[in-house]
Each structure stands twice: as structure tokens, then as C-alpha cells.
């Protein structure tokens, strides 16, 4: 029995299966409010140092300032990305990516697919990269980036990050002009739409982000998360993963303050630098930790390679 057709759920499963076949481990989304898939610890920590990584995962993302009370057909404060991170990147990674679009019935021979230069930067993560936006018929659907620096550290080797904008791709696949009309899933001709699931949340979260969040409460939360992160970083045996989570929570609070326009331009820059200082400290200590362990994933890759050579 065919239970689903051209829907949002199907889009996710196609990408998961495709990248699994390309050798990626499929991870689960980080269970914290973050602004992009890049903030997931699999990407942030995985791109530090020489150890290889092949990972893919869906990530729910929040950008409070982008909320439009559930009234804008393509602007959301909560949305989904599908993230792929590979280190070192294969030489034919762009073709591998284009093949994934083909599985989504997006054929470059039929549609106008362009790689438009757009170097990427994330100041709070101390990260930047050389990259492109991928446009489908004039609409951005993917960010394609070769990381040069993460946590203020030079990437050796570089990692490639591919970030699919799932809502935009789904709108193309389903020929919808309003994100809330997207079919999320269907079973026996019963359809659940994106709006059925998320439109009320967009209304309420937008009200909170722009009107009802307590600014003093947010300032206090930021300070407490910052202090907690510092404490965990500076332990004799630092809790780096936990500290990074506290930094992400502080970062979300910063985004809420930004949505409320509670920060002057100078204050905003100061908060960015405070977050960046913490992520840099985590990155440096994490690199040293992995180094002291002998970068074990490097050895694991060599062991797998040696076994494959013996079999062949």
C-alpha cells in the first residue's frame, strides 16, 4: 500500500537515504533551539582538527527575528534544514549534491540551477568559509560552503557543508506558493499540512519574540548561561559538550533580545564577541583533548582502509 507521495516527510526520507548511501552517518537533530544546522555539535566540533567526518541530519531551526505571525507565505521563525558535513570533501561533491536534487525530481537539464558565489560567516561561532548559494529558478534552496575556520581555528583539512532549505525545496516539489499549504504527510488520502502543524506556533512564537518576552528576564538568562559555560570550560577536566550547550542557550537568548530590539549596535557587537570568546575556548580545548587522545578517528579510518585493501 502506498502511504505517502510527494510530501515533506518523503523529502526528508529521500535525503536521509541518499546520504546514507554516500557513506554518511545519519544523526538526529540537536534538542536545543539553534539558528542553523551549523550550530549542531556534530558540525561545530566535528570540523575541528584532522579527524574525518561524514554526517547528515535534519535540524529544526529558530530565528526569532524572522517571525511574521504566521501570515507571511514564505517567512518563518521556525523551519527545517537538512545538513550534510563531510571532511575531507570528495572532489566530485558538487555532482554528488546535484544527484540528490535529481532524486527530488529537480533536473538541472530542465531547471535553472546556479551556484552563486556567497562566502559565509558566522561570527558567534568564529567560523567562515568559501561558498555558494544554490539557486533553483531564481530561489535559494541550498548553502554550499567549504569551511576555512571554525571556533577561530584554521580548518585542516577543510570540511564541506551542504545545507538544504527544506521548506523552499518542498514548495518547488509540490508547486505551492504558500508554505502553510505544503503537505507534511498523507495516509489513505488524508492530508496533514504544514499549516495544520505549525501555523499556530508561528503566531504564538512571533507574539512572544516581538511583544511578550520579558527583556530583564532575558538579560538575566544570558548572564547565567554565560557564567555556567565559563565554569564548565574552566573545570580541571572541562565538560566541553555541556559547556557548548550552555553557549547555544545563551546564543538563543541573544537572538530573542535582538528580536526585541533591546540591544544597541554596540551592545549587539559586544554580545556577539562574548559568545565568540566562549566558542573559541571550547574549540581550543576540544582540539587539545582530541590531540591528547591521538585523534582516534584518524586511526579508525586507516584501519577500515587497511581491511578493505586486504579484502580486495
Swiss-Prot record:
GO biological process: glycyl-tRNA aminoacylation
Catalytic activity: tRNA(Gly) + glycine + ATP = glycyl-tRNA(Gly) + AMP + diphosphate
Pfam families: tRNA-synt_2e (PF02091)
UniProt-listed InterPro entries: aa-tRNA-synth_II/BPL/LPL, Gly-tRNA-synth_heterodimer, Gly-tRNA_ligase_asu
GO molecular function, one term: glycine-tRNA ligase activity
Keyword Metal-binding assigned: no
Subunit structure: Tetramer of two alpha and two beta subunits.
Protein name as annotated: Glycine--tRNA ligase alpha subunit
Biological source species: Buchnera aphidicola subsp. Acyrthosiphon pisum (strain APS) (Acyrthosiphon pisum symbiotic bacterium)
